[in-house]
Amino acid sequence: MINQFKTLNPINLLLLFAYTFFMRIAILANPPERLNFEFLEPYTKLLIQIPIGNDFSTISNILLAGILIFIQALIFNRIVNNHALLLKPGFLPALLYITTASLFEPFLVLSPTLICNFLLIMIMDKLLKIGKSPNAIMIMFDVGIFIALGTLIYFPFVVMLLLIWLSLLLYRSFNWREWVSGLIGFLSIIFFLAIFYYWNDNLGMFYKIWLPLKNKFPSNFKIQYNDYLVLVPVAVMMVLAMIQLRENFFRSFISTRKAFQMLFFMFLIAILSFYTKPAFKLYHFLLCVPPGAVLLAYYFSNATKRWFYESLFLILVVAIQVFLFV
């Protein structure tokens, strides 16, 4: 299966579409009785009313989520190929994106993080361009706007602001205009939210929106390890990818090295930002899918022992299906 997607064969588009819904067989066969979809944060709903959410039936929710994942996978695949992050262009990034976006049941339904991943993929594309641009001011401004829009949908997305400055450290010499432009882009959207609260004599509530940033990082975690055994093959692939990346690190183009360092920071921020959400939900980690899928695609793109990597991928797919059905 991996070999099939190493090429840009158009038939792979149909195979990817079928594969997207194959990975949803378990939840389609036994759908939950009710699914709640909160598209915006409560502080945004006061400003913007979008008449969607609980109007979807369970099946419609699952099918629409699958279509969105498929669209994201194609956009993601184009970006990875355009920036030459793998040995050769193909559909491996899309395949791994769909696979990792199917790991857990909360990933298979509509969620704020699913919508935010459109923004995260666009941010990834913008940040991969800054090393090739003579001036990154407008790129950083756009990234700031994307992060602000994501924050209106899902508050932990605000922590992605750190990624702006980490990326500038990686790619460019210090230019205070570039460092400030991302923040200005972010504040240009948040400014309208502040004006709304001001008009309603409610600036105190606007201040409270940002209080979760002061939350202490939890020291104790209650984890049902049986629920996360599906991550074992993913962890093995990640380790193999890191080994592969280390072996090729100094033989790669400088832009490729910096790209994977930036993606590592994105992955880390996506994981750690959960602390800003008091009512933590597993779908938060859907934000880890774009950077994680690049790393997995890198491993399969460079792997040489076909019997091994095909077996490893098959084990992952079977494990996902088993744990979704159980």
Regions found by a protein language model. Give the residues of each.
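Hydrophobic alpha-helical membrane-interfacial segments at the cytosolic entry of transmembrane helices
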Residues: 15, 176-196
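Transmembrane-helix motifs of polytopic, lipid-linked glycan transferases
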Residues: 67-83
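Membrane-embedded helix bundles of polyisoprenyl
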Residues: 90-105, 114-121, 143
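Membrane-interface transmembrane helices that cradle and orient dolichyl/undecaprenyl
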Residues: 123-138
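Membrane-interface alpha helices of multi-pass inner-membrane proteins
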Residues: 139-155, 271
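Perimembrane helix-loop-helix junctions
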Residues: 160-184
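Membrane-water interface signatures at transmembrane helix termini and the short loops
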Residues: 246-304
